[in-house]
């Protein structure tokens, strides 16, 4: 065009700025910085929590994703403590029961292995704590009705099957709503033809897992807006062949660490298992003593700042109707986690101080991206799933992927490939570069 090179460079810079703006709009960061650099250093200098020790032991035992042991460690503490430790708040009394959902892509992440290792410890301490691994709604309610104030774990390795049955089976109708209320410890009364089931002071813990694509395929927007899905803390991990380890014998060091962990759990049980006498009329009744947790003023201030930060992120996102309740509920789960960490120290009183609150927020920092990923990808159609698969293939390669290779690997016709690549291109997710008779595909956003 006989224009100077400076004009061409200005056009290139403007085009680059437009692409950057589109990437920021479509791909907002989910890495929430919830701690300052000073707070992060303070947390790193603190002694290891029970969860940290459990994660370290789990990593030494095999190649299961370490994130899964984090979920297992908190589930153990919740099973041990949520029946006797309560946190009085201005909104009511909070029970530190946590729900975890472990999502995996393949067997290399060892989802079931990590869950089994945690539950083996729980069952050694309390063989009766597992309510069920499957069953009807009535069966679950009957099990809870017989154990008021006692924690009960619903442990299911493949939760996608239950979600599918809830949608299809009439006898499971209303199960999602009932589980949501049980999480909050609400009184439930179910009137059946032959009996009446009354549940008082339930303490329900859910420890579930599943293949990520199957779980997301079964979740719909109603599950999110009703509050059922946001009550879960989601843990995700991807397969890493570099972490693969062949099976071998247990070493003495590994066994000793497990014994130390079990000894700590036994001390927890002994510390928090005590009876007290209450008077009902002229009668004296023995019941388990309840320990009231509290937060220092500094811990309350830091928690409220953290909760406000989470809610603001949800409100300012592109879809506040799903992100806001999800992050708000995750904030409450973080408060429960802080109570569990404080109670695990077996001091004379359960008090959450500022360092303990910072430890809990550090865990939440890793949980938040998983929750956001789940609600953002819930209920995707088959075509959207195909777009995701192909985009991730392109994203994994820093040198680009040939269009012909994508068509061969995913058995695409020319028309199907045109539709998929045009869609990804117009969404600002990929860049297409001519390469001979075909084209090379690059992701505009590459995982670090």
Language model features by range: what are they?
Residues 10-448:
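Phosphate-handling catalytic cores of nucleic-acid transaction enzymes
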């Amino acid at each position: 065009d006989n224009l100077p090179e400076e004009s061409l460079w200005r056009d290139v810079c403007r085009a680059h700025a437009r692409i950057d703006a589109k990437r920021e709009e479509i791909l907002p960061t989910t890495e929430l910085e919830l701690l300052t650099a000073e707070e992060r250093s303070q947390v790193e200098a603190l002694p290891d929590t029970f969860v940290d020790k459990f994660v370290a032991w789990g990593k030494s035992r095999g190649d299961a994703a370490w994130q899964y042991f984090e979920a297992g460690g908190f589930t153990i503490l919740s099973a041990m403590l949520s029946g006797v430790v309560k946190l009085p708040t201005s909104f009511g009394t909070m029970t530190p029961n946590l729900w975890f959902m472990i999502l995996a892509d393949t067997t290399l992440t060892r989802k079931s292995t990590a869950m089994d290792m945690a539950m083996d410890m729980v069952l050694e301490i309390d063989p009766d704590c597992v309510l069920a691994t499957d069953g009807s709604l009535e069966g679950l309610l009957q099990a809870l009705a017989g154990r008021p104030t006692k924690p009960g774990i619903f442990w299911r390795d493949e939760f996608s099957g239950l979600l599918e049955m809830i949608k299809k089976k009439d006898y499971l109708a209303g199960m999602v709503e009932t589980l949501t209320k049980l999480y909050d410890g609400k009184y439930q009364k179910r009137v059946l033809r032959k009996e009446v089931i009354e549940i008082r002071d339930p303490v329900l813990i859910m420890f579930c897992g599943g293949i990520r694509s199957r779980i997301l395929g079964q979740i719909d927007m109603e599950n999110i807006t009703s509050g059922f899905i946001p009550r879960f803390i989601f843990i995700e991990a991807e397969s890493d062949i570099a972490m693969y380890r062949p099976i071998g014998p247990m070493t003495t060091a590994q066994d000793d660490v497990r014994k130390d962990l079990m000894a700590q759990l036994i001390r927890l049980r002994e510390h928090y298992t005590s009876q007290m006498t209450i008077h009902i009329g002229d009668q004296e009744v023995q019941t388990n003593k309840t320990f009231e947790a509290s937060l220092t003023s500094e811990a309350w201030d830091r928690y409220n700042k953290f909760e406000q930060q989470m809610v603001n992120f949800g409100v300012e996102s592109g879809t506040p109707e799903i992100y806001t309740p999800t992050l708000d509920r995750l904030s409450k789960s973080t408060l429960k986690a802080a109570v569990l960490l404080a109670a695990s120290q077996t001091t004379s009183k359960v008090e959450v101080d500022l360092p303990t609150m910072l430890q809990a927020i550090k865990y939440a920092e890793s949980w938040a991206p998983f929750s956001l990923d789940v609600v953002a990808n819930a209920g995707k159609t088959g075509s959207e799933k195909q777009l995701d698969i192909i985009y991730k293939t392109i994203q994994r390669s820093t040198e680009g992927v040939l269009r012909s290779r994508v068509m061969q690997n995913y058995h695409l016709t020319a028309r199907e490939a045109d539709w998929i690549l045009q869609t990804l291109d117009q969404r600002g997710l990929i860049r297409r570069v001519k390469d001979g008779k075909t084209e090379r595909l690059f992701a505009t956003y590459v995982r670090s």
